Swiss-Prot record:
GO biological process: tRNA threonylcarbamoyladenosine modification
Swiss-Prot/TrEMBL catalytic activity: L-threonylcarbamoyladenylate + adenosine(37) in tRNA = N(6)-L-threonylcarbamoyladenosine(37) in tRNA + AMP + H(+)
Main location: cytoplasm
Enzyme class: transferase
Name of protein: tRNA N6-adenosine threonylcarbamoyltransferase
């Protein structure tokens, strides 16, 4: 058994974790910045970076002490090196480099998206390659075929906004505050998903990509009309999102040879309505459905540590001069898609 220290600081969660190659999470801490960013309705990069700088070092010491592990006991240090808010990414990566240099341990620079892509393998030892992945978060919405560690084939992406961003915008329109995803999901439980006629962008298109900008605009018009209850708007928005997801999956993956498993990851993967719809979609096509525990859906260091474990087993480490990357696609060979390269 080998131990990896994982560090995550790409957005507004500061996190550190110790993860073993036998899938044991020895210790993990996470500090959210929701209260700091709530007055602004979204993440302010400067505030996020400052909070990471204040919290990360004592957090790392805390997980080391909790697990009873010394730096000499570590086998590698893994840190998110992108994509993300560059100030926060640099805080975590520089800290990882310092520890790696001082302890004489390998540095493993992790693509934050790869952390999400592999997170279900931390929780499920039976999940093997290949599998289809729906990656849905505040900054990304992609369908990928995961063929191995570092082997990702992008099948679809968003041409404008990510689904998590659409949830946050809907929450703001409805006065629900930040973060918006959980608030919209909660309000939607009291609404009628068929009450508000909202568009399903790209539905029926032969192209597999997503689009949510038009859906956001339609939510705003529905609210401004004064003709609908907020709960009905939330429920109708959520149902429109589900319909778009299932249609895009059908186009991206459809054929005679479905992947053996469908995995969902990212912050939006915590949405229970979306999970249930995906589970039904997979069952109808004889695919196994896998979703990580809720704690591994949002940004966390355990998934970064696990991605480090996966790469450590393959003897893949990185030089200490590895530079932070604000944009870092999982599939660098994927053809450019209009609007899709903005955040990855």
């Amino acid at each position: 058994m080998r131990i990896v220290l994982g560090i995550e600081s790409s957005c507004d969660e500061t996190a550190a974790a110790l993860v073993a190659t036998d899938r044991t999470i020895l210790a993990q801490h996470i500090a959210s910045q929701d209260e700091a960013h709530a007055p602004y309705g979204g993440v302010v990069p400067e505030i996020a970076a400052r909070a990471h700088a204040e919290r990360l070092a004592p957090m790392i010491e805390a997980v080391m002490q909790e697990a009873g592990v010394d730096y000499a006991d570590l086998d590698a240090i893994a840190a998110t090196a992108g994509p993300g808010l560059i100030g926060g990414v640099m805080v975590g990566l520089v800290s990882a480099k310092a520890i790696a240099m001082a302890a004489g341990k390998p540095l493993i620079a992790i693509n934050h998206l790869e952390g999400h892509a592999l997170s279900s393998r931390l929780a499920d030892s039976e999940l093997e390659f290949p599998y289809a992945l729906l990656l849905v978060s505040g900054g990304h919405c992609q369908i990928l075929l995961v063929e191995g560690v570092g082997q990702y084939r992008r099948l679809a992406t968003t041409i404008d906004d990510a689904l998590g961003e659409a949830f946050d915008k809907t929450a703001k329109i409805l006065g629900l505050g930040y973060p918006g995803g959980p608030a919209v999901e909660k309000l939607a439980r009291d609404g009628d998903a068929q009450a508000v006629p909202l568009p399903r962008p790209m539905l029926g298109s032969a192209e597999p990509h997503f689009s949510f900008a038009g859906l956001k605009s339609a939510v705003l018009r529905a609210k401004e009309s004064g003709d609908h209850e907020d709960a009905d708007i939330a429920a109708s928005f959520q149902q429109a999102a589900v319909d778009c997801i299932l249609d895009r999956l059908q186009v991206a993956l459809g054929g005679d040879d479905w992947p053996p498993a469908l995995v969902v990851a990212g912050g939006v993967a915590a949405n229970q309505t979306i999970r249930a719809a995906l589970e039904g979609f997979a069952a109808d096509r004889s695919m196994r459905f896998v979703a990580p525990p809720l704690a591994l859906c949002t940004d966390n260091a355990a998934m970064i540590g696990w991605a480090g474990c996966e790469r450590l087993d393959l003897e893949q480490d990185d030089p200490l001069d590895f530079r932070a990357r604000p944009r870092w696609p999982l599939d660098p060979e994927a053809e450019p898609v209009r609007g899709a390269g903005v955040k990855a």
